[in-house]
Amino acid sequence: MFHDYTQGAGLLRYELLPGEPVDEFTLEILRQNTPEGVLLLGRESGEEGDFLLLPVAGLIPLLSEDNSVINKFTKDKLMEEVKTIQASLRDHMIPPDELVLRPEWTWLDPETGKPVLPVLPTPLARDLSLSMDAYELLVAAICEKNRQTAEENTTAKQAGARASAKRRGPAKPWRRVVRDFWENLD
C-alpha cells in the first residue's frame, strides 16, 4: 500500500508486503503513476519495511546534481496541477477516508530553492474506489492537457513574433544602410 510520503518533490513510498515480489501485478498496480509506465526512483529496505520510491501521479520529479529531488513545475504551475488532480478525483467521488492529506509534503521551488507545501490527495492504490484504468486515463488526460497548453503557448508566441516583424517592416541589409548614409550626407 502507499504508506507514507518521502521528503522531496512529490515522492510516494509504496510499501511491499513481507515477501511480496516486484512482479507484474505490483507493477500493474503502480502503472497509474505515469501513462508511459512505472517510474521507479529507487528502493528502500530497512527495519520499517521494504519500499519502492515513486513520483506522485501527474507530477514528474527531476533529480538535481546533489540528488535532491526538484519538481519541474514552478510554484504556480504546481498548484494548478494539484487543483486539477483534486478536482478530477472529487468528480469520481472517492470517499475522503481514501485520500491521505499530507501538509508535510515538501516541494522545492526551482526559482528560490525554498520549500512549497501543497496538500495533495494520494489515492491508496489497493483500496481505491476508482479503477486503475480510470485513474490512468485521468493522469493521461492531465499530461495531454499540459502538452496542449504548451503547444498553444508556443503558437501564440510565434504569432506575436510574426506580427511584430510585420510592424517593423523588412530589415535593410547593412551595406545598403551604409550606402544610403553616405549618399544622403549632402
Q: Which positions does each model-derived feature cover?
A:
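C-lobe/activation-segment region of protein kinase-like
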Residues: D109-D186
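Hydrophobic, Leu/Ile/Phe/Ala-enriched alpha-helical segments that form helix-helix packing faces
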Residues: I29-T34, V82-I94, V139-N146, V178
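Catalytic-loop of the protein kinase fold
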Residues: T74, L78-E81, Q86-L124
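Short, solvent-exposed coil/turn linker segments
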Residues: P55-S64, P95, R102, Q148-A150, ...
